[in-house]
Amino acid sequence: MAQPGTLNLNNEVVKMRKEVKRIRVLVIRKLVRSVGRLKSKKGTEDALLKNQRRAQRLLEEIHAMKELKPDIVTKSALGDDINFEKIFKKPDSTATERAIARLAVHPLLKKKIDVLKAAVQAFKEARQNVAEVESSKNASEDNHSENTLYSNDNGSNLQREATVISEQKVKETKILAKKPIHNSKEKIAKMEHGPKAVTIANSPSKPSEKDSVVSLESQKTPADPKLKTLSQTKKNKGSDSSLSGNSDGGEEFCEEEKEYFDDSTEERFYKQSSMSEDSDSGDDFFIGKVRRTRKKESSCHSSVKEQKPLEKVFLKEDTGETHGDTRNDKIKPSTETRKLESVFFHSLSGSKSSRRNFKEQAPKTRSLDFPQNEPQIKNQFNKKLSGRLENTKQQLQLPLHPSWEASRRRKEQQSNIAVFQGKKITFDD
């Protein structure tokens, strides 16, 4: 049956038509049998007349049932509580009333009607509950709408205040943004004047540094005039090439690197230069002047290369002064030996004859060493082969994987199975 929430009584009545027709057929069959029994009874004339009247009444009910529509039967059964005995005791009851009462009282139809009545009652109760719930919802919605109106008013006021505050903040930020622009311009102007002052401050320190470099190079310059000229020409070439490559960013980096020199080291080198008794001091001073003019145009790359050997010499000179004059006398021959080494190009430190001899001797030594090394190579090869064989033997002796071991055992068992030696049976036997 239909649920009370979705009950439609007309649809239920239409669904009951088949049931009513089936019950009507059953009731008519029963009435026909009873009419036949009443007519077949025997007795007195009064009893026979009574039976004939009953049979006639039943025939009228049968004809009324045939003309009745099933919807009328179901609606009358749902509407009123039909009592069959009361209707039959009435003397003025019609055949249709009796026919409807007979059909409604039938037990099959009565069950269906009772279920429909319960569904209708539940549907009515549900409708009442829904109405109560809707009324409560409407009341709550009214209260909620009032609250939302108040909240919307408050929210609109807050939004207006927030917009006013945001507009004020935007104006303040614009004003502040204009001020830093002027400040930044002033800072840029200061920064432009600043580097000039820095360069002016650093410029007095350059001559002293360059003098120290000249004094160092006076110790490092070779004694032979040929080597002097070679090193000088190489330096000039390197400075010209570096000028073409790095002209912009070199000067700044050089100034940063030159700031690492200390005044103490400069004074020490002045002392060393004054104490030195070399005969070529005048020439070294002249060469230092020339280099000073070249260094003004040189790039950062050459200055960085100069500083690395200079720092090493600083450390060595410090140790020399602490140990005294006796230590200085020992250091002088070592410095004289170093005079043959070039500061920038280490390839010039050796003589040309030594390089030629090395080139001539190199192929001879290679050709001589090869046959001598042959037996050693053979011995090494034999050792490697023997080691590999031992490794393979050890690997064979190691325990195998369970799957490999099982397959090996299975193969052994198959090889051990004896060949069938009995007599083959044929169909002829």
Curated annotation (Swiss-Prot):
Biased composition (Basic and acidic residues): 183-195, 296-341, 357-367
Residue ranges with Polar residues bias: 146-157, 373-383
Keyword Oxidoreductase tagged: no
Residues recorded as bearing N-acetylalanine in the entry: 2
Cellular compartment(s): Cytoplasm, Perinuclear region
Coiled-coil stretches noted in the UniProt entry, renumbered to this chain: 42-67, 108-146
Superkingdom to which the source organism belongs: Eukaryota
Modified residues (Phosphoserine): 203, 205, 264, 279, 281, 349, 351, 367
Gene Ontology terms: cellular component: 90S preribosome; nucleus; perinuclear region of cytoplasm
One GO MF term attached to the UniProt entry: RNA binding
Compositional bias ranges of the Acidic residues kind: 249-265
Keyword terms: Acetylation, Coiled coil, Cytoplasm, Isopeptide bond, Phosphoprotein, Transcription, Transcription regulation, Ubl conjugation
Tissue: Abundantly expressed in heart and skeletal muscle, and at much lower levels in brain and lung.
The keyword Acetylation appears for this protein: yes
A Gene Ontology BP annotation from the UniProt entry: maturation of SSU-rRNA
Main location, first listed in the record: cytoplasm
Region (Disordered): 131-157, 176-429
Crosslink site: Glycyl lysine isopeptide (Lys-Gly) (interchain with G-Cter in SUMO2): 190, 316
Biological role stated in the UniProt entry: May be involved in regulating transcriptional activation of cardiac genes during the aging process. May play a role in biosynthesis and/or processing of SLC2A4 in adipose cells.
Quaternary organization: Interacts with SRF. Forms complexes with SRF and SRF cofactors ARID2, MYOCD and NKX2-5. Interacts with the N-terminus of SLC2A4.
Name by which UniProt lists this protein: Serum response factor-binding protein 1
Organism classification: Eukaryota, Metazoa, Chordata, Craniata, Vertebrata
